[in-house]
Amino acid sequence: MKRKYRPHNTKAQTWEYIENGYIEYWQGKHERLLELVRHIKNSHFKDRLFGSTSLDKLVVSIYDPIDYHQEALHITFDLWSRKWHFKYIAMPFQKPEFVRTYDEEKGIEKFDNFIKMIKW
């Protein structure tokens, strides 16, 4: 039986809105995610990439609305282990194509590398 896919679409938030959310809601606890959002906001990515947040997760895509289960990069930063977690979901009903964990200081570099690798 073939499964029917229903997109989990979410309207993208502006990078300013996301930045303010990390400042106001998390009150400095997620400084690494805030740094990444500021990096995107202040780069040429700001007009090519769309973002959305879900609690402590940043989801990035090239589409608006963002489908969380299709062509979406899910990024979290673990406050206890001080590690970045990147998970790229290309297609629904399939395992993520890309799952990586990075040291704290490598987040922005690895984000830029991922965007270049996937040609976003």
What are these regions (language model features)?
Residues M1-Y17, M91-W120:
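Mixed-charge, Lys/Arg-enriched low-complexity segments
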Residues N20, L33-I40, V60, L73-I75, ...:
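Generic hydrophobic secondary-structure signal
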Residues L33, K46, Q70, I108-I115:
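Generic N-terminal initiation segments characterized by hydrophobic and/or small/turn-forming residues
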Residues P65-E109:
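Intrinsically disordered, low-complexity regulatory segments enriched in Ser/Thr/Pro
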